[in-house]
């Protein structure tokens, strides 16, 4: 059930990217990063205004309704598929789905990495209270110093179902893969073979920092 909840978030993201690509002419490889940035910006403003929960429902509804509307009203579906599925976007959606299932199976915990920074604690507080975690009573000022962007990104993927540590990893990795897609998207379709080694290089880059 929890896997389906996260897949619903991925589906909403796909619908939002569909609107950006087919209506706003955002390249399919850049659409995931654009959509995630817009979602986090909206949720940050909503959390600051104290209306995070209803606005998140509205974001989901707009993404899903927009995607369905665009696909249902488009006449040339073959052309739509060609625009939506480029080397960069295929890499993104494939990795997003694969790692969603992987983290669901592995169920990684945040306890080994959350002793001081409270990055996972911030997400849990946001999920439980449906409010910006910086306003919570924790007995420590540390949480108030954290940037709300990443916890709210995780909140988007935590929205349905119960809180789970593995969903945080899903949200962060999907953001990570969206950067992959944007870089790979610079490669023309005719040179798709270059995308494979480039993706391998991008995968290794974070391990050097």
List where the protein language model places each region.
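Active-site lumenal/periplasmic loops and adjacent helix-entry segments of GT-C-fold
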Residues: 101-207
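Internal/C-terminal transmembrane anchor helices
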Residues: 85-105
């Amino acid at each position: 059930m929890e896997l389906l909840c996260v897949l619903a978030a991925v589906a909403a993201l796909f619908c939002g990217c569909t609107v950006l690509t087919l209506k706003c002419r955002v390249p399919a490889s850049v659409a995931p990063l654009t959509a995630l940035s817009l979602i986090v910006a909206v949720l940050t403003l909503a959390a600051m205004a104290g209306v995070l929960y209803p606005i998140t429902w509205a974001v989901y509804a707009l993404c899903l309704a927009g995607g369905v509307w665009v696909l249902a009203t488009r006449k040339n579906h073959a052309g739509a598929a060609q625009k939506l599925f480029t080397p960069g976007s295929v890499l993104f959606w494939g990795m997003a789905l694969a790692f969603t299932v992987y983290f669901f199976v592995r169920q990684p915990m945040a306890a080994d990495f959350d002793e001081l920074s409270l990055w996972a604690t911030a997400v849990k507080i946001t999920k439980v209270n449906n409010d910006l975690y910086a306003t919570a009573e924790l007995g420590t000022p540390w949480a108030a110093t954290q940037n709300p962007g990443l916890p709210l990104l995780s909140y988007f993927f935590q929205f349905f179902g119960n809180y789970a540590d593995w969903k945080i990893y899903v949200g962060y990795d999907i953001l990570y893969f969206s950067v992959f897609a944007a870089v790979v998207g610079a490669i023309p379709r005719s040179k798709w073979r270059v995308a494979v080694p480039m993706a391998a290089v991008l995968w290794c880059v974070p391990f050097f920092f």
